[in-house]
C-alpha cells in the first residue's frame, strides 16, 4: 500500500534518513519508534506529500485513502463537536453536504424551473448517502466521541470553547470516523484519560485497515501493533512482532553485533601486532604483505549505534516519620459540584499510592490538597514529621524563568552542585550537548516538564506528589524514570494514565468513584485482577 524506497532526508544540519527503506502492507498495524527528533513526524509528512525526501521516493498505491492525525489540529470554532467530526468523515461528509444543498434548493422558489433536475440529482445523491451508511453517521460520530469521554453537552456545544486537549480528541475522532484504508496517528494517546485510552485501544485493534502510529505509551502500543519500524542512525529497521518482541530482539541484535565487533577487533589487533612485529624482516615480507592486503579487504563491523539513556540515581532522601499524610473528614466542592464529603485517607511511609478516577472525579484535587495548593472547605490535611515534599504538576512549568538557559536554571537552583553532576542530570532527562544552552522560553511543553522533573528529583524529597509525570516523556526517558522511581525509598502519591507506569510503581490504589472511595492494598496489577477492569470508568 505504501512503499518507502531508499529515502534520504536532511533538516538544516541534521540528517534524518540515509537511503532508508520500509513498507506498510494491507492489514499491518505498525508502531513507529525512535528517539525525539529522529524523524517520525517527517516520515508521516512525506507519506502524505507535505514534505519530499531529498533522494528516493515514497509511493502510495492508487485509490488508497489516508487519514492523518497530528498534534497540530488547527482552528476549530463556530459549530458543534459532532459537526466538526462528521465534516472529516471522508466521502460521506461531502455527500451529506450536497444533500443539504439539494434540500435547500428544493424549497427555493427562485429555482422552480430547475426542480426536475434537482429532484433527479437528489435521488442519486440520497442513494449514494444510504450506500455509505450516511444516516447512521451522526450516531457513529457520537459513539466515537463518547468513547473519547465526551459528554452529550460537550458534543453539542461550540467546539471553539473546548481546551486544546479536547480539540485534539475531536481531531482524532474525525480520523476514526473516516475509517480510511490507512491511518497515520502521531501520538494519539496524548491528552487521553485512561478510559479513553482503553476505548481507543479496542477501536484500533478492531480496525481492519492499515495503521502506522507513534506513541509514548508502551502498553498501549504493545497491545495494538504487530510490527515495529525503528528509526535508528538514519535507517528504518523493521521487526515483525509487538513492542515487547521488538525490545527483546533489539537487545539480542545489539548483543550479537557487539560480540561480532569485539571478535573482529581482537582479530584485527592480532593481525596488526604480527604486521608491526615482522614488517622490518625480509624473511616475513610476503606474509606481512599478504596480511596487509587481507586487512584492507575486510568489511569492518561497527559497534551498536544505540543511543544510550543515562540512568538517574537518587541521592539518599532524609527519612520521614511513619505517618506521612493524614486527610481527616475533608469536604471539598467547586460551586455546586461536591468532590469530597467527609473523606478520610492516611498515607504511611514507603507506601506508593496511585489515584484512580474518571475525569472530574477529584484526582488532581486530592494532590493539590496534599501539596497545599488548595484548601479543604471542611476537615484537615496534615503532613507528618520530617516530611520533605516534591510536587509535580503541569502548572509547575509556568514558574520557570524563560530568559535563563537550561543549565543556568540548574546552576541557579543548585549553586553548590558543580558542573559535572548537573550536566549528568540534564543528560538523564534528555538534554545533551548544546541542548543545555537553550533558553527556557523556546522549550516545548514536554521539555519544560522534563526540566521541572529534573530539578525536583536532584535534591530528593521523601514524599513525591506527582500529577501525570509521564506526559511528554518519550519511551526511553519514561523507562529511565520508572527505574529511578523504583529505587526511591520514600513515599509516593501519584496520578497517571500510563498503565506500565502504574503497574511498575504502585503498591496501593485509591479508586474514586461516584459510589464512593475504595482502597486496595495491592498495586495496580492486583487492582485489575480484583476488580476485573483497568480503569474506574469501565466498572460494569
Where are these regions (language model features)?
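Extended non-transmembrane interhelical loops and adjacent amphipathic helices
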Residues: 119, 192, 289-299
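Short amphipathic coiled-coil heptad-repeat segments
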Residues: 142-148, 273-277, 293-301
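Short, flexible active-site-proximal loops enriched in glycine and acidic residues
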Residues: 153, 266, 304-306
